[in-house]
Amino acid sequence: MNMPEERKRREGAPLLEVDGLSVDFAVDNFWVPAAKKLTYDVRPGEALAIVGESGSGKSVSSMALLGLLPKNARVTGSARLDGREILSLKGDDLRRIRGREIAVIFQEPMTALNPVFTVGFQIIETLRMHFGMTPSAAKARALELLDMVDLPDPLKAFNSYPHQLSGGQRQRAMIAQSI
């Protein structure tokens, strides 16, 4: 079955199903809970805001979905992306979905963008890795994405290093890279 048929078959079903997601960290031979039994669905076209106090597990639970937690983390529960369990994915299987099917936009993009590469290079790298684009096609798409997120001068942003952009512009660049 090809992708459009698969999506059509699942129409109306949640795109992301998180059920009983918990994250604990091993600290001094004890398990310290960071997020407890989160359950939610996200359907195509929906937006979900996860809100809470600082330290309540918002970032940790999102990073668990992407397999971005340190080795001392323990993740339990279930997370299905388009019907496929993702918490157990490792290596190449995880890299294939990360950035292509699911992404996270960090609150402080200065820590997520590599300071030694231009914004354009980083977006092109993502496009080429996940979509097999040629360098010229990836550059054209990167500029289109930067325009989509309303950066005032997409070409200037493309050629800029992260420190040359404002915080809001870096955030938009991260959104462009995640689209």
Positions of PLM-derived features:
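ABC transporter nucleotide-binding domains
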Residues: M1-I179
